[in-house]
Amino acid sequence: MKVRVVAVGRDRSGLYAPAVDEYAKRLGRYLRFELVEVPEARKLAGTAGAKGEEGATLLAKVGPRERVVVLDERGDELTSVAFAERVRRWMERGQDVALLIGGSDGLAPEVLARADERLAVSRFTLAHRLARLVLVEQLYRAMTILRGEPYHK
């Protein structure tokens, strides 16, 4: 199984990228993992236009057979253990998974329509780059839970 996080934007501040890279490296011990960054849309077309452009770019990166899981504030809120169980089910299916993170304006309706699942990383509103870090860390945590390793206590 391959897991990809497909996210809008880059961490220009350099604040989150080192931690995301570290967890991505750790994840490589457990599964095939890839972080795909797509460019943010220019706001010239307005919020709806930018969301639509970003949505089209996100969907272009998704394979026809990939399970699509979007991060959405209205998605399922899971504990780390419940998320690990969800990851286990994905692994049992043997289906590749694409986890999509929208930009600062959220996800386009077309992206939400394509989603097989919706997950929320928190009830808080998070910067989308911070949400990326939380998601990658939780993926790593899920793998350690599934393997019975001591990272999750």
Swiss-Prot record:
Recorded catalytic activity of this chain's protein: pseudouridine(1915) in 23S rRNA + S-adenosyl-L-methionine = N(3)-methylpseudouridine(1915) in 23S rRNA + S-adenosyl-L-homocysteine + H(+)
GO cellular component: cytoplasm
Gene Ontology molecular function, alphabetical: rRNA (pseudouridine-N3-)-methyltransferase activity
Annotated Pfam families: SPOUT_MTase
Keyword Iron-sulfur: no
Top-level taxonomic group: Bacteria
Known function: Specifically methylates the pseudouridine at position 1915 (m3Psi1915) in 23S rRNA.
Family per record: Belongs to the RNA methyltransferase RlmH family.
Protein name, UniProt field: Ribosomal RNA large subunit methyltransferase H
Source species of the chain: Anaeromyxobacter dehalogenans (strain 2CP-1 / ATCC BAA-258)
Gene: rlmH
